Design a protein with these regions (language model features):
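Conserved N-terminal structural module of periplasmic/extracytoplasmic solute-binding proteins
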Residues: 20-109, 118-125, 139
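FAD-site-proximal beta/loop scaffold in flavoenzymes
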Residues: 127-132
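Bacterial N-terminal signal peptides that target proteins for export
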Residues: 1-8
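Short, well-ordered junction/capping motifs at the entry into regular secondary structure
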Residues: 134-141
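Bacterial N-terminal signal peptides
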Residues: 8-16
């Protein structure tokens, strides 16, 4: 399941590379810190370091986009996110457990990305069915 999540994460970052101008993006996560991950995803281990190495590689390949990572306190992650959505200071992207999607969807924090795949020439049929199930909520992706 971790490989599926990481594959989706890498695919999502690739969508960002189609941006036309310089962009700063913040990704928040709740599972550890990893500053020295490098950018070689083939030699990195541990979920936090693998994701950080994907971000580092993405940043190297896309100089007009700067993705930074914010590590949230594990025990307070969802409280922090709710507060930050309420005061318009939420991160651009954040990682969450699937069972939290309804909670955050109800406050308008979940974007439907269904049309984004086709927009960038990607086919949802290329996504592993189990991953597609995990990414689908209330008819959207």
């Amino acid at each position: 399941m971790k490989k599926i999540k990481l594959l989706f994460f890498a695919s999502f970052l690739s969508l960002l590379s189609f941006s036309a101008s310089a962009v700063d993006i913040t990704i928040a996560r709740f599972f550890g810190d990893c500053e020295d991950a490098g950018s070689d995803t083939t030699v990195t281990s541990g979920e936090a370091c693998i994701i950080q190495s994907i971000i580092n590689a993405f940043n190297e390949q896309n100089p007009d986009i700067n993705v930074t990572t914010e590590v949230l306190d594990w025990g307070q992650t969802y409280n922090i996110l709710q507060t930050r959505y309420a005061d318009n200071s939420a991160p651009d992207i954040h990682i969450m457990h699937r069972h939290r999607i309804p909670q955050f969807s109800s406050i308008g924090a979940i974007a439907d990305l269904s049309g984004e795949l086709e927009k960038y020439g990607m086919d949802s049929g290329d996504i592993v069915p189990m991953m597609m199930d995990a990414l689908t909520y209330d008819g959207g992706m």
